[in-house]
Amino acid sequence: MAKWVYRFSEGNASMRPLLGGKGANLAEMTGLGMPIPQGFTVTTEACTEYYRHGKQITDEIQAQIFEAIGWLEEYNGKKFGDTQDPLLVSVRSGARASMPGMMDTILNLGLNDVAVEGFAVKTGNPRFAYDSYRRFIQMFSDVVMEVPKSYFEKIIDEVKADKGVVYDTELTADDLKELIVRFKAVYKEAMKGEEFPQDPKVQLMEAVKAVFRSWDNPRAIVYRRMNDIPGDWGTAVNVQTMVFGNKGDTSGTGVAFTRNPSTGAKGIYGEYLINAQGEDVVAGVRTPQPITQLEKDLPECYSQFMELAMKLENHYKDMQDMEFTIEEGKLYFLQTRNGKRTAQAAIQIACDLVDEGMITPKEAVMRIEAKSLDQLLHPMFDTDALKAGEVIGEALPASPGAAAGKVVFTAEEAKKLGKGGKGERVILVRLETSPEDIEGMHASQGILTVRGGMTSHAAVVARGMGTCCVSGCGAISIDEEAKQFTLGGYIFTEGDYISLDGSTGKIYKGDIKTVEATVSGNFGRIMAWADEYRKLGVRTNADTPADTKNAVRLGAEGIGLCRTEHMFFGEDRIPKFRRMILSDTVEKRVEALKPIGEFQKADFKAMYEALEGRPMTVRYLDPPLHEFVPTEEEDIKALADDMGLTVEEVKAKCEALHEFNPMMGHRGCRLAVTYPEIARMQTRAVMEAAIEVSEEKGYEITPEIMIPLVGEKKELKFVKDVVIEEAEAVKKEKNSDIRYKIGTMIEIPRAALLANEIAEEAEFFSFGTNDLTQMTFGFSRDDAGKFLDSYYKSKIYESDPFARLDQNGVGQLVKMAVANGRKTRPALKCGICGEHGGDPLSIEFCHKAGLDYVSCSPFRVPIARLAAAQAAIANR
């Protein structure tokens, strides 16, 4: 018989895939002799089984759960559902990868109308007993039955107003009894006449099912897609004996880190609340005290906590994020995990752990999430602009960086206006965030909350995303329905600008200018270690000297893709290029190309100078010509005047360039076949620039000329012959013996299939995975967004094939092309220059496929360097 349930004493940290992160760590802590409320874990396999059986828990799994409850009753000397001294449990989810705020917790399960009376007598604390029951009704209704939390919050606010009190803790036992009656009425109404369940076994099974269901709720799916977590992992369920932090002033609950998760500084960092339950801190409902206050309130608990926290860090050799509860002076740990941290903190902690002798440089490189380096290059406020800024409030600096943008009050509005929507800069202002807000948080430049501490949902999720966040600004008076808030004597409505400093917690009026960040010395150490271990080269995709310098500063070893068409769009250039496009004879085109050639040459010279001898792959003209022709009336008239044509003639010529499917039309090398004079002009510009810079600066330059969109060997040979003829003519004129290479972009499936033939003519391959993905899947990058969401929801695809290389299809073409190309030309250099070149999982694939380098946008160069090192270490 399969084992679906494990006691904490039966597992260990290595059983993470089966027990989930939380369950495996609780088992490990039990083995370490830590004070853990005992319990058991229902495995991730049971979750998979639940989905396999049409969202039903099998009899076998249910029997094992009740058997484990029997053991827990024996262990605690209490009975589940007892009317005198009931066993109460918490039910928490725990996936293999940490998914903060994604899955929901239920506390005090096992209480009912009768048990609560016995519980009040047994504890001698009626207020505590009824508070525990009202919390359970609220959580069970919200998490299990999806009755909105706001219904209950509204009743609490009404009762507090009636009684003339401010805090929940000021409500008496009788007030809480009144709440319970009203809560159950809300439940009954929402559940269409069904009463709140009184049988603890029914409560438990419904809660377990709810955790399994929550694995597939929309916000969990979004989080998984954003963090590369496979959908088939499933979640475990942890059932744990309740301990109570809300029993009075010698009880409390808190969350703490062994190092600062924002900066990485060594030392306990955290918060706690006296007389509260765990979710109060994490959910950010009340704003807590710093952990140092615990030393004054409960000194013995504090010293025991400090000692055990260090024991955990030394055991796991990493910063720990711990949840704890103190029940009447006795300390319990509810969980520990490797803490989520900012990229800045990750680097600081990794370097410190190496210096402390706890880990090796190789382990340090593996500790840092490559994708998170994005955050390090976060903007900061311009110093002068900041001096003029008006501080209107200050709260907790929950996630670093600087952000300025328009105020929005809902996640929907943030999604509509922000990143991925209209692309405007928005700041999401909320009373408190909840997991439903995750997509809106992702679309925002910054997040500002009224409630919640440094460990609230908003803080943890924002740090993970690298989004600036300021939390717990109690000075704000917010009206979410009217979409306005008041702070510092000002009223702000939707669309007004504010600025946030997530490193100091300061809130400013207006739109303060931001500047790019500078990186610290420890960043250099990590990058030096990464460069030592990686096998893949890292280049950049850049078309301007400024981008090139930036990429070189961030460690790029050259340019893997210089898109020459971007050089034609300058205000003084585009009219000349349009003139060339609309010229109707070769002679006129050659004439029109002369000034354009000079522009290109000047640009290439500036690029070669910025590269200081590093290689550059120049891609010849790729987009269809219609992309360059004018669409505005004024531009059409100017072009007509310039060429001595009528407006109608210009419009007719532009119309003639129109294509039904331009991305598969007259573009790439097809332009060079039709208009060889364009390839000649570009060759002359590249060769003259390279020769002049190598002579002036003494750099050794070998131009790499890349012909795009080749699908046939003879097509490449035709363009190559044109290039060689012009290149040799330039060498002769300049009396130069400079060497150059001619290669191609592999972006048409046919080219990948015939790579052995194409390699007879090409000296290098660069995989243009954007087009290769479009043509292999048969859908357009610009239109796929309209239907891909349905594909994710239906679990047809787990990730966007344009962001994450499709290893099963497109990846096979890449592997085949590399292998077959090298059969023809063993020293064939192969790289990748699509957007995938900056994605860590795609980089690991490139390492395994035997590519020589990846090329990505300048700001992703550090990510690629680190990901390449991690791929080399993981696959050695």
Predicted regions and their residues:
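Conserved alpha/beta-domain cores
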Residues: R92, V519, W529-R876
